């Protein structure tokens, strides 16, 4: 502070009052005002949620363990509720499932807005959560996304700020500790339910000629260009695959998924979007590459990313085991 006074005095003597005002006083006043507005702890940015008594149910498990299903069933039975997903496709599927069950559900993904004035439920991408609306039950899916450099803030915001007395968090095992720390920092109660995979996942010891794929195979690459290229190669060998990638229009993607589900297309080529909650009859996952561009750099896949995608093989109730 003494050093600041010396700087101010020197400016006053050399450049006059107007310079002191613009160079010293205004920036100091702005910093002081901002410090009063910014909470010392992120949880304190959500006073309405802090005033509630919330109970969290953590559904912890790998892919294909039924953890999301458990939370979703509770959501549909509640008078009001919200489902938060990492992908617009998952939010759309959640809305369709609830509407088919007679639950009046709106949709908000940023790209698609389908709002019913009389809705009791909302399906949305994590970023679109309203912090003003209260719900009886909230389900936040794929909570391991909290560690994502670009989108993790949305899961932090949802967990700290959602206005619901009962909150279900569905997450991979590696996210458990950070989720518990967040919940404990809020003073909320919690319980942990561990979901185990019922179908074994086996790692093959040899490479696969992808032009000799078998029914139920999913070929994974990490770009739209890669998906279209691999799909075209398969067509050249007389195999018509379904395709999935992030920018594919919903109606087109839905048709592709239905084609794979009903057997019209026996193979599927996809980006890592397939790892996020899309329940498809996949027998074997084939990685076409082990690197991806994450928005910043091209890097090797992380172990948890490999597990998330590979876990889609061996859908429960359809195949006795999965292969990768």
Q: What spans do the regions from the language model cover?
A:
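Post-DEXD/H (motif II) to motif III coupling segment of the RecA-like Helicase ATP-binding lobe
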Residues: 145-196, 200
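Conserved strand-helix element at the start of the C-terminal RecA-like helicase core
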Residues: 80-91, 169-170, 213-237, 241-244
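Conserved interdomain hinge at the start of the Helicase C-terminal
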Residues: 70, 75, 154, 196-233
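Conserved helicase ATPase core of P-loop NTP-dependent helicases/translocases
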Residues: 113-115, 243, 248-271
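Conserved Walker A/P-loop ATP-binding site and its immediately adjacent core
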Residues: 72, 77-99, 175
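Short, small-residue-biased leader/transition segments that mark boundaries at the very start
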Residues: 2-7
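Conserved segment of the helicase C-terminal RecA-like domain
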Residues: 174-175, 280, 284-324
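Inter-Walker segment of RecA-like/P-loop motor cores
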Residues: 98-134
